[in-house]
Amino acid sequence: IYLIYLYFFNFYMYFPVIQKSFGNISLNSESPMDTHNRALIGALQRDARLSFSALAREVGLSQPAIAERVRRLEESGVLNRYQAVIARERIGLPITAFLRLTCPGEKYRAVAALAADLPDVLECHHVTGDDCFFLKIGVDSLGSLERVVERFRAHGQTAVTIALSTLVENKPVVAPNTEL
């Protein structure tokens, strides 16, 4: 009996930690990535402007069920924004480059702030390995690229690779099948 008491005491003592670790996943709710949610996410990635009625037809649920699922996916952070995908070359930003940056640890916040402030920085990743940061940059000219690189060079050692062409970009995310 003492062991059973310890088991339940420890479970309920750490239950808030378990809940925090798994976010909004509840032990009693449906799987957050069931077949309908995967279909819904796929449809929204193909066209985020679809109405709830169009989504309902595509996913095979009612409009209220779709609205509720979208609300839950937004609240849980699965859907965190709706964004247009821009053809950068058509608006005068034909050059895509990748910047690798190696810098001391104390420069982390300064680099993150700079990356957030520069409109030419499309993505910034803190990475493992020899480099500390990997950034995707979109610019109108090599002169603009050079100015961006110089801003980061003040924080550490840089290396730049220019993309000749982009073969795969903005590929839809496919949620894993977690149903048993």
Question: Where are the language model's segments positioned?
Answer:
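A compositional/biophysical signature of low hydrophobicity enriched in polar/charged and small residues
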Residues: 2-180
